[in-house]
Each structure stands twice: as C-alpha cells, then as structure tokens.
C-alpha cells in the first residue's frame, strides 16, 4: 500500500534503533509502563479525532493485547509478580461523547488516555480542543457534586496532516512502543499460545 511505499515507518524504525534521547516510541513505552505499574491505570483509552483514524484504536487493541497479554518471564518461564499489558479500548472521539466521555469525566476509574488528532480535520480538531480543555480544567468550583467534572491526565498526539507518510510514522511508533514495553516486562510479544488453545479446542468441537 501507499503507506509502506513511503518513508514514514522507516524513519521511526531508524529512530528506535539508534537513539534514546529523541525516540517517541520509547518515551511513550516508558510512560505507559509507569501508568500501568506505578499509577495502577490498567486500561488504555485511545480516542481519535480524524475520521480517517476512526479504526486506529481497534488496530492498537489487537497489537498491544495480543503482544503484551502475557504472564510468564521469557527467560525463566516463571510467572511474573507484576502487571503486564493493559486492556486497550477506544473509538472515534465524536461518536464517544455520550459513552466514553461520561465515564472519563465523572467516573471513579482512571485510564491511560490518548487523543489522536489531525489539524487537517478542522471541526474534529476544534472538538478535540474543547474536550481536552475540559479535562485539564475540570469544574471544581461547581457547587453541585453531581455536576463536577474530574481533571484527568492524558496524552495528545497531534499530526500536522494525515498523509501516507504520517500514518506510517504513527503505526511504526505504536509497533515499536509495544516492543519496548515487552522488553521492560521481559515477555515474549511474538507468541499467542492462549489464542492457539482456543483454535485447538474449537477444531475439536467442529470435528
């Protein structure tokens, strides 16, 4: 596809292999591990504010949960004493106004939250700014407790455009971030034996 013909993914791969100080994938991996293991945020919420990115959360869900849903040390084979991959969920931001956002603004559980936005989608960009401003400021002065909105931590990834090259960079960042997280937790991101067992038992039922 056009995405992989461009140099976007290659650029991020080269950064991930050569540098520590200017490595977006590594920075996000460290952040996600801190959120998961130190701040006990066991879910990752991904909200996109460009229609072309409306399915990105589903891609990230498959990538991260299949790769990082492990509980065994890759070297010793022993069960790990710490948490690994989080539950990944999300969707297209404008469609999430009355579902995810109610939970995000007033729920009791916090999530490691990402906003993905492109400046080229002007209406969605304005909505993104409005929503994130609400999360930054909250409304603690509100006298009615049932109307109060929580302040939340979140990460914004702002894309200048949504070209094939930029999309390739975003995909490469997520793939490299996932690899780095598997290294921090010392798990094997390349096997899916839980999935395989399901296939085997399903085949037995069919036969």
Language-model segments: residues:
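Solvent-exposed, flexible loop/coil residues
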Residues: 60, 72, 91-92, 108, ...
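Short, conserved catalytic or adaptor-binding loops enriched in Gly and charged residues
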Residues: 77-81, 145-150
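Active-site phosphate/pyrophosphate-binding segments
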Residues: 1-114, 119-124, 197-207
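Glycine-centered secondary-structure boundary/capping sites
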Residues: 40, 107, 117, 138, ...
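Short alpha-helices
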Residues: 1-11, 149-193, 197
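Membrane-targeting and insertion segments and their boundary/processing signals
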Residues: 27-34, 38, 144, 164, ...
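Generic preference for well-ordered secondary structure
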Residues: 40, 44, 48, 84, ...
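Acidic, Ser/Thr-rich peripheral helices and adjacent loops at domain boundaries
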Residues: 122-146
């Amino acid at each position: 596809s056009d995405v992989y013909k461009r140099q976007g993914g290659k650029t991020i791969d080269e950064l991930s292999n050569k540098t520590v100080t200017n490595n977006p994938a590594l920075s996000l991996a460290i952040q996600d591990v801190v959120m998961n293991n130190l701040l006990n945020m066991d879910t990752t919420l991904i909200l996109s504010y460009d229609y072309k990115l409306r399915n990105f959360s589903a891609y990230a869900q498959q990538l991260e949960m299949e790769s990082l849903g492990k509980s065994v040390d890759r070297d010793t084979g022993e069960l790990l004493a710490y948490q690994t991959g989080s539950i990944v969920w999300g969707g297209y931001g404008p469609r999430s106004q009355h579902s995810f956002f109610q939970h995000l603004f007033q729920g009791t559980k916090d999530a490691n939250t990402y906003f993905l936005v492109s400046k080229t989608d002007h209406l969605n960009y304005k909505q993104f700014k409005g929503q994130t401003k609400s999360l930054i400021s909250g409304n603690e002065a509100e006298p009615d407790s049932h109307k109060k909105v929580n302040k939340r931590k979140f990460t914004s990834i702002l894309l200048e455009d949504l070209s094939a090259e930029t999309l390739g960079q975003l995909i490469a960042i997520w793939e490299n971030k996932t690899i780095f997280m598997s290294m921090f937790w010392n798990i094997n991101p390349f096997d899916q034996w839980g999935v395989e067992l399901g296939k085997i038992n399903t085949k037995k039922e069919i036969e």
